[in-house]
Structures are given as C-alpha cells and as structure tokens.
C-alpha cells in the first residue's frame, strides 16, 4: 500500500503520533528522570523525614539501599530557583517537535501550530510544590527551614510519594530501565508502574489523616491543582492526555494488583511479569492476568523518494484517539481494545511530513472494528492529507500526510481521551470500593462500552450513572 507521494507519510503518522507525542516530546519532558548511580552508604534521614521513610518501607516492603540527601530551603523563591534548572527545550527537542506537530496534524489530533516542545516544558515546570526530587544530584529538596520544621500534610504526602519512587528505583532500577526502553509501550508501562505505586502509597498515607489534617490537605491539593490547570490552559488537550495516560492507567493497575491474592504481585509486575503494553494495564484481569501477548508487526517501508525520520509505536491509547477521529469514543474504545501491536514511520516526501502505519489486531473481529473506525477517520481528513486505509488479514494499513498548519480540519475534543482514561479511573474506584478486581474490571469495561464518559458526570438526563453502575454490577456478579 506504500505510495510514492507525500500523502503516504502522513498516513503512518496518524496512528503513531500519539506515542510520538508521548515518547518523542514526552521523553524529553521527562528527561530529568534519568538513571543515576546510588551512593553506597547506609541510609539515614533527618528527623522530620525519617517517619515518612519508614512508612514507605513498611507499606511497600521495599528497603532503601542507599543514602538519599535531603536539602531544606525555607525561602519560596530560593526553593524555586534551586529546583527549576531548565533553560527550556533544546534545539533537538524543537526540531523533533516540528515533525511531531506535522504528524499530529496528519492524524487529526490537532490543527495549526501546537508548539509541543514549549507545551512539554510548560507541563513540566508549572505548578507549586514543596518537595522536589533531583535524581541527577541524588537529592530531595524540601521547602522548610530544617529537619526540626513541622511539615504540612500536603508536603508530607508528597514526600511519601517521592520517597516511594526513590525506593522502587533503587530496588528495581526503574530509571535505568526506562532510559533503555526499546518501545514507547515499554517506557509507558514502567512509568505507569512507578507512578501508580507511588500514588497508591500516597493514598494509603493520606487515609490516615485526622479530620483537620484531611481538610487542610484537600484544600491545599485543590488549590495547587487549580494553579496548575490555569497555567497549562494553552496546552492542547490531546497532547495533555498523552502525557497522563500511563499515570492514569498505571494507578488503576497497581490498585488492582494490590488486591490480588498474590501478595508479591507488584514485585512480579516490576520484575518477572512486566506488562507488555498499557492495554494489559487497562484490563489487569483479562489482558494481564491471562497474558494477552503482543502480535508481531513489521514497520512500514519508506516509499521511494522519501527521507526517513523515525519509527514509533502508537499503542492502544494512540489507536483509540485515532479511531475517535472517525467514530464515537465508545466505538473507538471497543475497537482499540482489540489492539495487538503497531508500528509507524514518519518520513518526508515532496516537502511534506507523512506517516505510514501498520496496526495488528488481536483477531478478525477486532480487525473489523478497527478497519471500520479507520475508514471513518480517513473520510474526515482534509483532501490535502490524502489519507489511505488498507487491510491485509488482521493487519490494518494507513497512510496520511500533514495538510499544513493553515488547513481547516476537525480535531479531537476531551470526550475522546476521557472515554479511555475515565474507564481506568472507574476501575480504580471500584477496586477501592469492592476489593474485587474481577468484578471491578467487568463493571468498568461494560459501563464504558455502553455509555459515554460524560454520562458518569451526569451530563445525560436519561442516564443515572449510579443506577447504571449498580445494574451492571449485578450482571457482572452473576457472570464473573
């Protein structure tokens, strides 16, 4: 299906720009989190940090294996100057983001000029915090006078989260493994595990707050969240969703694993039974527990006359977003659940950035759903994109080109990403409420198969979300 024209390249970008945005720009944005050599010293802690470190060790059953330096800075501006060591996007990041932007326009994720490198920088540097981990310096910086200072509930909670990340990194070498991750899915899985475990421990810790502490914590967390959201309103919604996908999915996955019968389930997930992709994390019972393997896929060839730029992987969330450009988010999610693997290339041809992709489905029925969504997506692309869709058994093929920053085209709204990410949130909520991952997964999958994400927020007057969840829950009890 390769085409010798510029439209060919944009086609591949359609499917993989999601992973592209999350990995190409995202990896730069996460560049501060890199592997580092841990000093070989017996861990010791300041007086106001020691109880938090012990709590992390007791909760995770992971022991700190190396000393962690702690630096106290009470002055807000000095603290900010200390932890903000970022001169903005590098020349390489800016160059890569120009290609990423073109691929995203081809795929219909955004139009115009979204300035992805600047957006990644803004997401990373926005928001107030009283705790920062500087891994390359082997130090945690705390906004407080000294080790005798009384820490606020939110700062103690953030320290618990950061200390969990550090302990897991020391024990499982997560930073080094993420740095060496061969595919975007490998990277996102490890990031999701790390962040998901840290947030799980944070939730356990904050649940111990008394009423006064809990009220102060909620108010501070809400205030910081609003400040962050206000600061990043200019960032494209689809790009923002790409940046939080692994965190959202990982948090639900970790919650489910901690409820499993095997008390070592998290240890296995970090080591001998690492999820193959985030689709296994979205369905920890059926896709992870039953080990849904990745299908084999070969990257498309660069068409004659094209200049190769890079190869990426879209992943199930990327495929979902792609399909949501042509069919309702409910249908896009059901189709994306049949993702088996994918590979796409970005290249330049006749002065334009294009992309070709191969998406392998789990089976024929899944391929039928993905094909339907891709054809609907192609029909919405501007004529200048020259979008093509093909099929070879259970492998779907697509080719599309950047229509240009001035091209008018439909783009994704929040409903597309919400359908995927909110399902993970519902899974986490049900696991917390019922303690039963099998039942919880059944409820989450069926609710978002039958309903739009907005239904859970009461946007549809014909749907009572609580009654719907209860009804689905009764059905699931009898079927799982």
Task: Tell what function each PLM region has.
Residues 232, 416-480:
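Mature extracellular/luminal domains of secreted and GPI-anchored eukaryotic proteins, especially small
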Residues 340-343, 351-429, 434, 438:
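C-terminal soluble interaction/assembly domains
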Residues 56, 154-174, 195-199, 254, ...:
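Active-site recognition of the HExxH zinc-binding catalytic motif
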Residues 140-160, 186-189:
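Short pre-active-site segment immediately N-terminal to the catalytic Zn-binding motif
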